[in-house]
């Protein structure tokens, strides 16, 4: 197997490791002899310290063998914004009041307003408190894994550039890919929870097949629109998504949940704060059978766009099934939906960047002391993370119902609690 690193790459890595292990860079690896000298200096700091230094440097280094990229990295938020405890304050607009600076006639009632009257004063200290809603996102989930490194592996790694490159391959590449895919799977659960949660709350889920049939007074099925009438349907979908994207820029109480005991929350989502995740195979068909510019993400101008080839399972790529965590709009508490939701065909979701996401708050690798009997070390990786779904932020889910005659029109199936089917998605929205 070919090495994953060039000699220049190896020198840079080992110099970084030396700085991490010793705190100084008095010797720099520039060729084989200096590489060995630096390796000896590092090993003199102790094998446990050496492995810790290697772990620290490599966990922040991209190794370009065949790294696996998280297909849903679009969901990841920063620790600064989404740490372990987040208090999100929402401010409501205050109603305008009668002017006290002029005597005037009320335009609605016709009554005369005379605040400026001889012998009276205008109270400029009338209290009018701001109206706010506080939403708390708390909680931390933890994850741990470890692997074993034998002492001879470490000693051999510093004999030459090629040995070190082989060591790095065994040390990190597969491990890094495994961790990245773990993140993707958790991001996928957050996405499933958000999509099913919007439907469980009856909150802006658009059946594009039903909308098409309503607009054009037709009774086409989903299968017909995806084949015989694909051109017309593609144009309709493109126009609808672009229109919705523009509508999200308006400051309204639409496209998100509102608490029943509070005034409506006014939200707007500028283009730069919009994100979109779409099922790409359909648009590949559109590009191949219609024309490539009918739906181009760049035309939307959203902040971030991600195409995926399946939502939940590769064998059933368009399906989404889940019993979501939702927001109780009566008491403001996070709760689990009473019934699971099943979509046959989800097309995509357009959402505010604060609507959902994951946050990896802490990642570190720690090495154990040498096992004297077995001559090996264990390297543990610890991860602390959290997820969030804020249903009070804007989001629109697009799905394709079965279509056909109105009596046969399909909405996502809602499973009863006695159903034999199992939910495969259950993620806390705001624990």
Where are the predicted features?
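Extended, compositionally biased alpha-helical segments that mediate assembly or anchoring
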Residues: 1-65, 69, 294-431
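Assembly/oligomerization interface modules of large self-assembling protein complexes
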Residues: 54-147
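Long, contiguous amphipathic alpha-helices that act as assembly "spine/axial" helices in icosahedral shell
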Residues: 131-204, 375, 379-381
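Loop-centered beta-sheet repeat module
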Residues: 174, 185-237
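Extended oligomerization regions of viral-like shell subunits
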Residues: 224-357
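Alpha-helix boundary/N-cap detector
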Residues: 5-8, 12, 38-49, 53, ...
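Short glycine-rich, low-complexity/disordered patches
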Residues: 30-32, 68-78, 184, 250-259
């Amino acid at each position: 197997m070919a090495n994953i690193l060039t000699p220049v790459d190896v020198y840079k890595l080992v110099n970084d490791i030396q700085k991490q292990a010793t705190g100084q860079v008095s010797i720099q690896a520039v060729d084989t002899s200096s590489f060995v000298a630096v390796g000896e200096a590092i090993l003199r700091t102790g094998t446990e310290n050496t492995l810790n230094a290697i772990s620290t440097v490599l966990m922040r280094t991209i190794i370009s063998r065949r790294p696996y990229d998280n297909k849903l990295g679009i969901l990841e938020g920063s620790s600064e914004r989404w740490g372990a405890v987040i208090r999100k304050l929402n401010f409501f607009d205050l109603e305008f009041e009668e002017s006290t600076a002029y005597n005037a006639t009320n335009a609605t009632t016709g009554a005369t307003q005379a605040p400026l009257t001889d012998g009276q004063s205008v109270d400029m200290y009338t209290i009018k408190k701001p109206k706010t809603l506080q939403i708390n996102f708390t909680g931390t989930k933890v994850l741990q894994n470890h692997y074993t490194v034998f002492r001879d592996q470490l000693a051999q790694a510093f004999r030459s550039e090629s040995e070190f490159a082989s060591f790095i391959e065994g040390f990190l590449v597969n491990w890094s890919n495994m961790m990245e895919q773990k993140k993707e799977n958790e991001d996928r659960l957050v996405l499933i929870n958000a999509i099913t949660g919007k439907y469980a709350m009856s909150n802006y889920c658009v059946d594009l097949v039903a909308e098409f049939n309503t607009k054009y007074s037709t009774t086409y099925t989903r299968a017909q629109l995806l084949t015989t009438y694909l051109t017309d349907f593609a144009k309709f979908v493109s126009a609808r998504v672009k229109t919705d994207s523009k509508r999200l820029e308006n400051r309204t109480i639409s496209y998100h949940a509102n608490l029943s005991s509070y005034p409506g929350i006014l939200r707007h989502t500028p283009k730069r704060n919009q994100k979109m995740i779409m099922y790409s195979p359909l648009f590949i068909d559109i590009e191949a059978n219609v024309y490539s510019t009918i739906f181009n993400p760049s035309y939307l101008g959203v902040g971030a766009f991600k195409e995926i080839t399946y939502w939940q399972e590769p064998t059933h790529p368009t399906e989404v099934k889940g019993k979501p965590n939702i927001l109780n709009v009566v008491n403001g508490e996070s709760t689990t939906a009473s019934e699971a939701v099943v979509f046959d065909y989800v097309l995509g979701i357009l959402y505010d960047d604060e609507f959902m996401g994951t946050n990896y708050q802490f990642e570190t690798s720690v090495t154990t002391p040498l096992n004297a009997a077995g001559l090996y070390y264990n390297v543990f990786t610890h991860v602390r993370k959290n997820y969030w779904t804020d249903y009070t932020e804007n989001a629109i889910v697009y799905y394709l119902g079965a279509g056909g005659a109105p009596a046969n029109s399909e909405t996502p199936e809602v499973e009863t609690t006695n159903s034999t089917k199992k939910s495969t998605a259950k993620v806390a929205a705001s624990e």
